[in-house]
Swiss-Prot record:
It catalyses: RNA(n+1) + phosphate = RNA(n) + a ribonucleoside 5'-diphosphate. Transmembrane segments: none annotated. GO terms for cellular component: cytosol. It holds the Pfam family RNase_PH. Residues 581-640 form the KH domain. This is Polyribonucleotide nucleotidyltransferase. CDD domains: KH-I_PNPase, RNase_PH_PNPase_2, S1_PNPase. Residues 652-724 form the S1 motif domain. One of its GO terms (molecular function) is RNA binding. The keyword Magnesium applies. It comes from Beutenbergia cavernae (strain ATCC BAA-8 / DSM 12333 / CCUG 43141 / JCM 11478 / NBRC 16432 / NCIMB 13614 / HKI 0122). Keywords: Cytoplasm, Magnesium, Metal-binding, Nucleotidyltransferase, RNA-binding, Transferase. Involved in mRNA degradation. Catalyzes the phosphorolysis of single-stranded polyribonucleotides processively in the 3'- to 5'-direction. Mg(2+) binds at D515, D521.
Length: 744
């Protein structure tokens, strides 16, 4: 779009031999009544409209910043009509919810502290190229629209996806290019002086990583390689931030004055500190969470009660001041004494326990505990037709591994709403899913849909990484042949000025309190050989990449220790549970698919009815057969092979066949699907000791089993049968050849 009222700026992402990508930020044409509106375009094909608006009046009753990020996926962006009953977009997809979290996390820390006006950022996907994703473009669009909105925002922030493709970190990779990638990483950051400080990371090894690493010799995404990726993202982030800043210099509104509500005034802090300092310091050395929190609540209640008279109507300030003092003490102990509230050193891990097969009947189960964090993992297997069907803007249309995470309120000893998952639960489930996807067996190697559920039964730090560990154990217990076990650990960071210099302390296996009062939540999952998933959230304006590289190395030590503990519980896949379905495959020629299905599905339905198996056929001729037991699945496979991979019957072969039709001169007997023969009335007499048979129906009825032998095959391939009288027909046996040559 061009016009006198339109301002724009562009950023060029130079990927060398992989070409360039152009990101354009434009404002002045659309959504003019929003406080800030930016149209972001990637290579003129993918278009996202970002708007930022602020409420006119502050929400004084809130003790948090009410920022909301919404992503509106429009199916017309991809030339689609929604598949819902009303043919209209409804509730946001999982991908949209994850994109909301991806945008919220780097933006939230950059607003002025104490802001209580509602701020809403809405991302509308207007057009999308089928080979591109919109989420990273939306991060930049959200930053740009907020930067020009007149809100107190210390941006801009730039976001880029980099993928490690054939040894090169490529910015804004296409889906087709990522098929050759071993690692995919979204990095957000802001320019600080001559450097770029990292504010958010979301990364994972790709679905194809294992094949590329083990089969084609691609480099594994080790901690050192991932650290290189963070550095590789910096020039791209700088270019995006500079383009946003250039747009803001020409189009930004003047920053408005918004009321800021500090959590407490200095006099409240001083009074609380004088009242509780000694008691608080002692309470923070109690290792047990419940006991410690009970004692902290007692101290707070006593302090508020004692000071209430002098701070009438300011009780919230006293509580906030007490929380700030608690934070100060915890951080001071860590930075100066290397002491943590539960008595551990900075690199120590809480006690670990791992157990499998903890539930009856289910296909796989495990219980993983790390300190007071307890996760129950449960695995369910089924046929591939039960995999999740996706109706999204991405080219991915199905998902066979589904990871659901539940965080009930009782896990923290509280009450609350239960039911449909919240955004946090969806995000945690997606993180655990990404950590495990790279080690799943291939579809043809393990043709099952897998649903993994993580139940957070008790929480005191990093239930998402506990879910990764419990899921690995549970899937091995279910018989899933994982390529390697995966474990996860949450790292924390505390930073402050000590003796005139900024000091950083990295914590291994953080508690809930260390997450709340620290500066970073850095989750790392992986195998013994490489990293499979990363998630970084920070409350700072940014963290030096060198600090993150050190945290990655420290996380690896912890991960290896956890994997050792898990291996003591289970280190190889168990036998599949008796309650799990059995799925086998058979390959049929593509031109035989129609014969297997039959007219109007008659043949495949007959096989399913006869054997009790479920059958699904892929376009390439792969047939998946699922049944509650092995014999049923094998019977279905034999029936399919008899149609699609037949052999010519031979004289002398014996079968237990099924009568499918009777006539005045005999009975037609089905030997295998599609292969019938005539048992003449003269042969039927042998079944009754040679007595005369007036009506065939008096001896044989449709559906009855009878053992026969092929007596003759005429030139047209028609079969004449003889009755076998020396053996009793097996009424409940499936139609199958009684000699080895009759097996199909």
């Amino acid at each position: 779009m061009e016009g006198p009222e339109i301002q724009f700026a562009e950023a060029t992402i130079d990927n060398g031999r992989f070409g360039t990508r152009t990101v354009r930020f434009e404002t002045g044409r659309l959504a003019k009544q929003a406080a800030g509106a930016v149209l972001a375009t990637l290579d003129e094909d993918t278009v996202v409209l970002s708007t930022t608006a602020a409420g006119k009046h502050p929400k004084e009753q809130f003790d948090f910043f009410p920022l909301t990020v919404d992503v509106e996926e429009r199916q017309y962006a991809a030339g689609k009509i929604p598949g819902s009953f009303f043919r209209r977009e409804g509730r946001p997809s999982t991908e949209a919810i994850l994109a909301c979290r991806l945008i919220d996390r780097p933006l939230r820390p950059l607003f002025v502290k104490g802001l209580r006006n509602e701020v809403q950022v809405v991302e509308t996907i207007l057009a999308i190229h089928p080979d591109d994703s919109y989420d990273v473009l939306a991060i930049n669009a959200a930053s740009a629209s907020t930067q020009i909105s007149g809100l107190p925002f210390s941006g801009p922030v730039g976001g880029v996806r980099v993928a490690l493709i054939d040894g090169t970190w490529v910015g804004f990779p296409r889906y087709s290019e990522k098929e050759r990638a071993v690692f995919d990483m979204v990095v957000a950051g802001r320019v600080v002086g001559d450097d770029v400080a990292i504010t958010m990371v979301e990364a994972e090894a790709t679905d194809n990583a294992w094949e590329l690493i083990k089969g084609e010799g691609a480099g594994a995404p080790t901690e050192e390689v991932v650290a290189e990726g963070l550095e590789a993202a910096k020039p791209f982030i700088r270019a995006l931030c500079e383009a946003q800043a250039a747009l803001a210099s020409r189009a930004a509104k003047e920053v408005q004055v918004f009321p800021v509500f500090p959590e407490y005034e200095p006099d409240a802090y001083d009074a609380v500190e004088q009242q509780v300092a000694d008691h608080l310091d002692a309470a923070l050395r109690i290792a047990d969470k419940q006991e410690r929190e009970s004692r902290l609540d007692e101290i707070k209640d006593a302090a508020v009660g004692a000071l209430q008279a002098g701070f009438d109507g300011r009780e919230k300030e006293l509580s906030a001041a007490y929380r700030a003092l608690t934070k100060k003490f915890i951080r001071r102990h860590i930075l100066t004494d290397s002491f943590r509230i539960d008595g551990r050193g900075l690199k120590d891990i809480r006690p670990l326990t791992a157990e499998v097969e903890v539930l009856p009947r289910v296909h796989g189960s495990a219980l993983f505990e790390r300190g007071e964090t307890q996760i129950l993992g449960v695995t369910t297997l089924n046929m591939l037709k039960m995999e999740q069907q996706l109706d999204t803007l991405s080219p991915v249309s199905r998902k066979r591994y589904m990871h659901n995470y539940n965080f009930p309120p009782y896990s923290t000893g509280e009450t609350g709403r239960v039911g449909s998952p919240k955004r946090r639960e969806i995000g945690h489930g997606a993180l655990a899913e990404r950590a495990l996807v790279p080690v799943l067996p291939a579809r043809d190697e393990f043709p099952y849909a897998i649903r993994q559920v993580s139940e957070a039964l008790s929480s005191n730090g990093s239930t998402s990484m506990g879910s990764v560990c419990a899921s690995t154990l549970s899937m091995l217990n279910a018989g899933v042949p994982l390529r390697a076990p995966v474990a996860g650990i949450a790292m924390g960071l505390v930073s402050d000025e000590v003796d005139g210099e900024t000091r950083y302390a990295t914590l291994t296996d953080i508690l809930g309190a260390e997450d709340a009062f620290g500066d970073m939540d850095f989750k790392v999952a992986g195998t013994r050989e490489f990293v499979t998933a990363i998630q970084l959230d920070t409350k700072l304006d940014g963290i030096p990449a060198s600090v993150l590289a050190g945290a990655l190395s420290q996380a690896r030590e912890a991960r290896l220790h956890i994997l050792d503990v898990m291996a003591e519980a289970i280190d190889t896949p168990d036998e599949m549970a008796a309650t799990a379905p059995r799925v086998i495959t058979v390959q049929v020629p593509v031109d035989k698919i129609g014969e297997v299905i039959g007219p109007k599905g008659k043949m495949i339905n007959q096989i399913q009815d006869d054997t009790g198996a479920d059958i699904s056929i892929e376009d390439d001729g792969t047939v998946f057969i699922g049944a509650t037991d092995g014999p049923s699945a094998e019977a279905a496979r034999q029936a399919i092979n008899a149609i699609a991979n037949p052999h010519m019957p031979e004289v002398g072969e014996r079968f237990v066949g099924t009568v499918v039709k009777t006539t005045s001169f005999g009975a037609f007997v089905s030997l295998t699907p599609g292969k019938d023969g005539l048992l003449h009335i003269s042969q039927i007499r042998r079944l009754v000791g040679g007595k005369r048979v007036e009506n065939v129906e008096d001896v044989l009825g449709v559906g009855q089993k009878v053992q026969v032998e092929i007596a003759e095959i005429d030139p047209r391939g028609k079969l004449s049968l003889h009755a076998v009288v020396e053996e009793t027909p097996a009424d409940d046996a499936p139609a199958e050849a009684s000699t080895a040559t009759a097996d199909a």
